[in-house]
Amino acid sequence: MAKGAREKIKLVSTANTGHFYTTDKNKRNMPGKMEIKKFDPVVRQHVLYKEAKIK
């Protein structure tokens, strides 16, 4: 069976609150690290989230 193109990732807040989102991405279409602005409920603001590996 073939390996899937999608990989599970964790998006960690850059506000150092410890909050994170989990999602998946297509590693063929997006080979680099994902960065996206999302809402951090701890600081109640939109902040930058950076990709990290799920352990």
UniProtKB/Swiss-Prot annotation:
Keywords: Ribonucleoprotein, Ribosomal protein. SUPFAM superfamilies: Zn-binding ribosomal proteins. One of its GO terms (cellular component) is cytosolic large ribosomal subunit. GO terms for biological process: translation. It comes from the Bacteria. Disulfide bonds: none annotated. One of its GO terms (molecular function) is structural constituent of ribosome. Belongs to the bacterial ribosomal protein bL33 family. This is Large ribosomal subunit protein bL33.
